[in-house]
């Protein structure tokens, strides 16, 4: 195992933050795994520690067939943000920016540099594109902030990967994944191993999130150069490992073994591993997800559990105004999987309370919430 420590730029006087990468194995193929980019989403970090131990063991046994890079703490900035006893890990407090938005878009500068050098050899194209992605990131002007510097380091390690896992969670949720529709056939095994509730599929959710910054450039390049052989060569996903409180030992170990079993299936680990379950969740268009909001201020009482299938018109939660004796029941506007609910129980208009993944598209434009 090799430990790589990257000091982040623009640290405050008298302090320094470091992004640590743990590199296992050797070879031409690569997996990149990071956890807790939203720093208060800790099931991924706990799972990453299980992975760290198991990968060291597998490496010592000579079982790894390729490189696996692991970043257990992908956001040391957000890990250090606490306000009056509450961890604030989703947004950078100084700028208000979401830590998982606005990553560098690589396809345009890559196309400008190598468009005339792409041909019919897919493997040669993959190698050239990956090399150029790294060059583009290395040649950018110095980062203007610590957040920008951290973003570049994360993307620099992931841009040449064959498989990228970005480990997150939701407030109270079933396990679910976000991915490209083109990659869903490959992800079905991991979803089944994790017993995920749903997969949300789209090419562009509108936020330049980390996983899409790894996977979507390949689609854009393939469309820009239709005569060239350009496969979607970075299999990237945002993997939501359930609820914010899902950090029990058994949960982390189960997540770890599911991920390792998937990587073994993909040829990165030798040995005997359990076969993926036959039963798997549905892959649904992210355009089919409904966000449900409270119509007024009040206390929320949820009537259904995260992970349940609900029908259009089913009552999902009540909002109670105890001063004016006003009670409003909010119902599902689409049939699908109630895959996440808010953790807060006092709400206001404009704050989402529940998410239902449906089979039919009902939204356009920006799909992801901040």
Language model features: what each stretch is:
Residues 1-370:
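Structured catalytic-domain cores with a bias toward divalent-metal coordination
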